[in-house]
UniProtKB/Swiss-Prot annotation:
Its main location: membrane. Keywords: Membrane, Signal, Transmembrane, Transmembrane helix. The chain crosses the membrane at residues 75-95, 112-132. It is a multi-pass membrane protein. This is Uncharacterized protein YDR366C. One of its GO terms (cellular component) is membrane. It comes from Saccharomyces cerevisiae (strain ATCC 204508 / S288c) (Baker's yeast). Residues 1-24 form the signal peptide. It is found in: Membrane.
Length: 132
């Protein structure tokens, strides 16, 4: 019994670390990618404006890229905020599973997991609506 519990604990900790690293990497990569593309489009607009002398075109495209950048940032932040309660839910359910394996007579049943699942989903919906 102890080997089953310790191996599941190691797998659970590996999963938590993997999820945290993945969310951090995706957030940083998406910000870098968005900044990179906005700079390329901005330089292209400046070059086109100097060559063809259309002063309004640069302003329109630059404002569009800026708005796109802000919307993309908000989308990434929504993904992170929705992902944090899911990570907490995964941690709590993992601890529940470890306790069920180690101590069968603790009294943790699957019905309590359903209550936890519904409360975390309600928290995610409230956070998502609050952002928008």
């Amino acid at each position: 019994m102890v080997t089953i519990g310790s191996s599941s604990l190691v797998l659970f900790l590996f999963f938590v670390v993997f999820v945290q690293i993945t969310y951090t990497a995706l957030h940083r990569f998406s910000r870098l990618l968005c900044t990179f593309f906005s700079k390329i489009i901005e330089e292209g607009c400046v070059w086109y404006n100097k060559k063809h002398r259309f002063p309004n075109l640069y302003k329109y495209i630059y404002v569009y890229v800026y708005i796109l950048h802000i919307c993309f940032e908000k989308y990434v932040n929504v993904e992170i905020i929705v992902g944090i309660p899911l990570l907490i839910k995964a941690i709590i359910l993992g601890i529940q599973n470890i306790l069920e394996v180690l101590l069968k007579d603790l009294g943790i049943h699957k019905r309590e997991s359903a209550i936890l699942h519904n409360s975390i989903n309600i928290i995610i919906i409230i956070l998502y609506v609050y952002i928008h």
